Amino acid sequence: MDQSNMTSFAEEKAMNTSSRNASLGTSHPPIPIVHWVIMSISPLGFVENGILLWFLCFRMRRNPFTVYITHLSIADISLLFCIFILSIDYALDYELSSGHYYTIVTLSVTFLFGYNTGLYLLTAISVERCLSVLYPIWYRCHRPKHQSAFVCALLWALSCLVTTMEYVMCIDSGEESHSQSDCRAVIIFIAILSFLVFTPLMLVSSTILVVKIRKNTWASHSSKLYIVIMVTIIIFLIFAMPMRVLYLLYYEYWSTFGNLHNISLLFSTINSSANPFIYFFVGSSKKKRFRESLKVVLTRAFKDEMQPRRQEGNGNTVSIETVV
């Protein structure tokens, strides 16, 4: 396998190792401060999402929205774990053996898998909430009871397919011209899927959601849920979306965009780590902030007053959604 087809971390590792081996007796180049910041933020985000996942799975009753949040938390955990290990690996500067190379590639591909899944899940959340506002009767009375779990399973499968294509055609391909053309085709496909399908769906549904909520006072009682959705999407578009742009450009223009790659990874780390903070601050009461239990805060943040009726009984919400 040609070394030039490594993922970004692997390529940086190879370049870094070769330069150090060529300059014996000199001091090692300093580790970019970006990696130190990533190594500081990612463990915090990993723990936050782990606590959130535990509450969602074992301490809280589920509704359609929390099923999506559960899967989003799993995607964030996988992303943060991989980027933390990759940053440590870069800092320790191990020799790039064949086995080590495959470990780096596996972590990098898993990182992309978590990133792609996060984009797809956020789009699904935005679209479903938009439908619940546009068609409230359908949402409350006719929505399939396992729709959230089914959609999440489909999106995980789509993310797996897209990530596998990116790995096979762009990361693990050779220098041959047909391999490069295949990679360009995959880049175009991912760009269309990300920027002409999912991102526009997210933006349009979010815009409709905001307009409808501003016009209807009946939505005020569940405004925290909508605030959670909107803030999460805005943070994703600001911090995480640039990474996908740079990753696609990276395959063709490493010399131009390679230096910006670490910054994009830092932004993606911030995005995945910020989600639990968003849920906490939106769900907490201003007068009782830091004095309420986390379960109460999360329940308030994820409360869905438009929850389908078949999920309610005797005035209490009954969990029927399952996490795949």
From Swiss-Prot:
Residues 1-35, 87-103, 172-184, 245-262 are extracellular. The keyword Transmembrane applies. It comes from the Eukaryota. It is a multi-pass membrane protein. GO terms for molecular function: angiotensin receptor activity; G protein-coupled peptide receptor activity; G protein-coupled receptor activity; peptide binding. Glycans are attached at residues 5, 16, 21. One of its GO terms (biological process) is positive regulation of canonical NF-kappaB signal transduction. The chain crosses the membrane at residues 36-60, 65-86, 104-127, 149-171, 185-205, 224-244, 263-283. PROSITE patterns: G_PROTEIN_RECEP_F1_1, G_PROTEIN_RECEP_F1_2. It holds the Pfam family 7tm_1. The keyword Oxidoreductase does not apply. Expressed in platelets. Residues 61-64, 128-148, 206-223, 284-324 are cytoplasmic. Disulfide bonds: none annotated. GO terms for cellular component: cell surface; plasma membrane. It is found in: Cell membrane. Interacts with AGTR1. Interacts with FLNA (via filamin repeat 21); increases PKA-mediated phosphorylation of FLNA. Receptor for angiotensin 1-7. Acts specifically as a functional antagonist of AGTR1 (angiotensin-2 type 1 receptor), although it up-regulates AGTR1 receptor levels. Positive regulation of AGTR1 levels occurs through activation of the G-proteins GNA11 and GNAQ, and stimulation of the protein kinase C signaling cascade. The antagonist effect on AGTR1 function is probably due to AGTR1 being physically altered by MAS1. This is Proto-oncogene Mas.
